[in-house]
């Protein structure tokens, strides 16, 4: 059997103006079709708290260490703490108490990387309160922790066990003088 082989010569040539192969988009409509009304600069409808500026005061920055969420506020009362715990329970977060005996304020010890704001490790008070449904249970544990460690910083955290993240953390108790 005889084999016949044929070759076809192809000529490739670069197009001198390949950028012009796509036509420019010309489908924009003129502005005449869109009615535009020119409004005067009227700022009377914008929200303002200008009348209340005199009563707003910031936390004094000198000599005050920053702790956790809500650290710019005065110390929370028992009722306010209970409301915060109710909030984390409504969000189905697991309450947990942690305490620190030496440094309750932010500083870097164990981690120097910028990914996590703080290198501290706090000691957990008992186990996370899985199944807790009442803020009174958390407040009872807080009182026990304060009784055991009166010179400790104690914080309450809310842990989302589905997403495996800590969602809220705030100082519940500080030593005298802080």
UniProtKB/Swiss-Prot annotation:
It is found in: Plastid, Chloroplast. Residues 1-54 form a transit peptide. Keywords: Calvin cycle, Carbon dioxide fixation, Chloroplast, Photorespiration, Photosynthesis, Plastid, Transit peptide. It comes from the Eukaryota. GO terms for biological process: photorespiration; reductive pentose-phosphate cycle. Its main location: plastid. The keyword DNA-binding does not apply. InterPro entries: RuBisCO_ssu, RuBisCO_ssu_dom, RuBisCO_ssu_N, RuBisCO_ssu_sf. GO terms for cellular component: chloroplast. Heterohexadecamer of 8 large and 8 small subunits. PANTHER family: RIBULOSE BISPHOSPHATE CARBOXYLASE SMALL CHAIN 1, CHLOROPLASTIC, RIBULOSE BISPHOSPHATE CARBOXYLASE SMALL SUBUNIT 1A, CHLOROPLASTIC-RELATED. RuBisCO catalyzes two reactions: the carboxylation of D-ribulose 1,5-bisphosphate, the primary event in carbon dioxide fixation, as well as the oxidative fragmentation of the pentose substrate. Both reactions occur simultaneously and in competition at the same active site. Although the small subunit is not catalytic it is essential for maximal activity. This is Ribulose bisphosphate carboxylase small subunit, chloroplastic 2.
């Amino acid at each position: 059997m005889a084999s016949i082989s044929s070759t076809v010569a192809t000529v490739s040539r670069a197009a001198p103006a390949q950028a012009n192969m796509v036509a420019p988009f010309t489908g924009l409509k003129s502005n005449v079709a869109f009615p535009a009304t020119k409004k005067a600069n009227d700022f009377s409808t914008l929200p303002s708290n200008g009348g209340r500026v005199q009563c707003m005061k910031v936390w004094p920055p000198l000599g005050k260490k920053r702790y956790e969420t809500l650290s710019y506020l005065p110390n929370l009362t028992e009722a306010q703490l209970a409301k915060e715990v109710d909030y984390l329970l409504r969000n189905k977060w697991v309450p947990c108490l942690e305490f620190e005996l030496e440094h309750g304020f932010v500083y870097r010890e164990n981690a120097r990387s910028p990914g996590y704001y703080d290198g501290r490790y706090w000691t957990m008070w008992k186990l996370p309160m899985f199944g807790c449904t009442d803020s009174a249970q958390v407040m009872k544990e807080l009182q026990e922790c304060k009784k055991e460690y009166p010179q400790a910083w104690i914080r309450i955290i809310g842990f989302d066990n589905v997403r495996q993240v800590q969602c809220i953390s705030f100082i519940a108790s500080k030593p005298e003088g802080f």
